Amino acid sequence: MMKNILAIQSHVVYGHAGNSAAEFPMRRLGANVWPLNTVQFSNHTQYGKWTGCVMPPSHLTEIVQGIAAIDKLHTCDAVLSGYLGSAEQGEHILGIVRQVKAANPQAKYFCDPVMGHPEKGCIVAPGVAEFHVRHGLPASDIIAPNLVELEILCEHPVNNVEEAVLAARELIAQGPQIVLVKHLARAGYSRDRFEMLLVTADEAWHISRPLVDFGMRQPVGVGDVTSGLLLVKLLQGATLQEALEHVTAAVYEIMVTTKAMQEYELQVVAAQDRIANPEHYFSATKL
């Protein structure tokens, strides 16, 4: 059965971020994606200028009411949320999650708690971080913080892999069954590798791949693609190890393709066959 995912995050008309980054790779792995956009911008904000608007929170609810009105909400297998334009949007998204789970009790909520990257110029609206700590985290089935977001969610520093696993389990005690630490950064084993963790109450998997050097301008949307692909693989029945290994390889293929084409925006269309069938392989290690 094809899986249906309601993906609620940002949208850019030019380039790739949020749904504009994740939607196509998720479809390429065989999932139906229902993109619902929290913002519509001309381009992502790290260009330093952009046009567009943040959607009113009620818009999100209205769209989902429309899907419910044609009696299709029960076919939704998961809700994915990413970049929020406001904390109020978050409240509406949790209402949507409750509505989807009422229609399909098997449905999952995957929260990508985007809280900004100060060094990358990514900023979020006031109250969004607090929303994720107080409401998004306990409501989620799967949550995917980077290292900075993990520290905000668990409310203490995380300095190494062992502490990251323990921090992930602190989050699990509050709601989610699965935590993806989607970028270990300085808490990883190695400074010259890109490392991730996938943690449950009784399993922890670590994986690393080479960093792809883009100099000063790192592509945007890597985390959005990572979260979306992991959700698809898990819904399709992959084990934690299989899901982590495929996603790591697929994202690496996108990065390598983007670098080879000397582009700044992720080249998800050019890399599409390698997203489905990666040529590289990275092995996850059980901790």
Curated annotation (Swiss-Prot):
Pathway: Cofactor metabolism; pyridoxal 5'-phosphate salvage; pyridoxal 5'-phosphate from pyridoxal: step 1/1. CDD domains: pyridoxal_pyridoxamine_kinase. The keyword Nucleotide-binding applies. Pfam families: Phos_pyr_kin. GO terms for molecular function: ATP binding; magnesium ion binding; pyridoxal kinase activity. GO terms for cellular component: cytosol. Its EC number is 2.7.1.35. It comes from the Bacteria. InterPro entries: PM/HMP-P_kinase-1, PyrdxlKinase, Pyridoxal_kinase_PdxY, Ribokinase-like. One of its GO terms (biological process) is pyridoxal 5'-phosphate salvage. The keyword Kinase applies. Keywords: ATP-binding, Kinase, Magnesium, Nucleotide-binding, Transferase. Pyridoxal kinase involved in the salvage pathway of pyridoxal 5'-phosphate (PLP). Catalyzes the phosphorylation of pyridoxal to PLP. This is Pyridoxal kinase PdxY. The lineage of its organism: Bacteria, Pseudomonadati, Pseudomonadota, Gammaproteobacteria, Enterobacterales.
